[in-house]
Amino acid sequence: MNESKFTNWGLTVKTALLRRGKTQSWLEEEITRRTGLYMDAGYIYKILTGRRNAPKIVTAINEILEIKTQAHHKTNRIS
């Protein structure tokens, strides 16, 4: 079974959502509202697991969730 793994940054994002009582769908809507870019669950999942590099989206997520200087690295996955 091929199990996808979140990057450290992706795990930080998921944890920040849980702490705020917000869903990934809420985050997708906020990203779209702030950037004007369409966001869906599949694309955000690829970003959180390091399969996609989207600097504008990462910046928006960091701002929305108030994540401080947490780097987004494709190779930094959680087992």
Model regions and ranges:
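A short, Lys/Arg-rich alpha-helix, primarily the initiator
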Residues: M1-K22
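DNA major-groove recognition helix of helix-turn-helix/homeodomain DNA-binding modules
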Residues: R52-H72
